């Protein structure tokens, strides 16, 4: 039974890009046993890895319209590769998942978030651990909007992968609970960044009582 649960847990953590529903393949397995269904639903929705706009929209429909109670199980959300993500779908998804403790976004989903009202509202997802991957595209004015969101009021740990020059920009955010920032610098970017820039960024964060750690082990 334990092995069965571990296998199902692994299955539901991944989203098939060709599927029109995040956990489409899971339901046939769970339908075998009602007891198994009730035990695995919280596991199935604990961590959601969304890799397409369709997956986000389908999940939003499930959590907002079909089964709102499932939203209480969601503790982690990762959204990537959603260039054409509808802002309203993302907004409704974030407003429904009030118990999220960690979140991961790439550039595309971060830009989509800037087009919604979700980050500015008092209700909705408020993660404690936040991870951003800014290596897949460029951010311009969106960054100023992004770091000012009320959504980040509870963030204690921030993990960023991308251009070190963005570190100083992010230091201007509110970040009332933030204690540490770990910045993963791709080796391809290290040769173009001076140590002076990195030292200045560390000082900016240090002045706020926040620790910034550079990590250039990322490839």
Mark where each language-model region is.
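Hydrophobic regular-secondary-structure patch
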Residues: 1-99, 105-108, 112-114
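Leucine-rich repeat
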Residues: 37-42, 59-72, 89-99, 113-126, ...
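Leucine-rich solenoid repeat modules
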Residues: 9, 152-219
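Phenylalanine-focused residue identity feature
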Residues: 21, 134, 141, 147-149, ...
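Hydrophobic beta-strand segments of well-ordered beta-sheets in folded domains
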Residues: 7, 46-48, 72-78, 99-103, ...
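Low-complexity, intrinsically disordered/propeptide-like segments
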Residues: 6, 11, 124, 137, ...
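Concave beta-strand-loop units of leucine-rich repeat
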Residues: 78-84, 104-111, 130-139, 159-165, ...
């Amino acid at each position: 039974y334990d092995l069965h649960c571990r296998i199902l847990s692994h299955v539901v953590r991944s989203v098939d890009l060709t599927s029109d529903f995040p956990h489409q393949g899971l339901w046939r397995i769970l339908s075998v046993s009602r007891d198994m269904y009730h035990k695995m639903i919280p596991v199935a929705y604990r961590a959601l890895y969304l890799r397409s706009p369709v997956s986000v929209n389908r999940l939003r429909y499930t959590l907002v319209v079909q089964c709102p109670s499932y939203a209480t199980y969601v503790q982690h959300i990762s959204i990537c590769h959603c260039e054409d993500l509808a802002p309203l779908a993302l907004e409704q998804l974030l407003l429904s998942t009030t118990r999220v403790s960690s979140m991961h976004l790439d550039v595309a989903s971060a830009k989509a978030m800037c087009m919604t009202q979700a980050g500015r509202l008092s209700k909705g997802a408020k993660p404690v651990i936040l991870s951003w991957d800014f290596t897949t595209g460029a951010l311009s004015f969106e960054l100023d909007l992004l770091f000012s969101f009320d959504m980040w009021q509870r963030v204690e740990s921030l993990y960023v992968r991308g251009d070190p020059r963005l570190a100083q920009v992010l230091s201007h955010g509110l970040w009332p609970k933030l204690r540490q920032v770990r910045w993963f610098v791709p080796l391809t970017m290290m040769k173009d960044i001076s140590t002076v820039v990195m030292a200045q960024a560390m000082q900016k964060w240090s002045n706020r009582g926040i620790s910034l750690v550079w990590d250039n082990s990322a490839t």
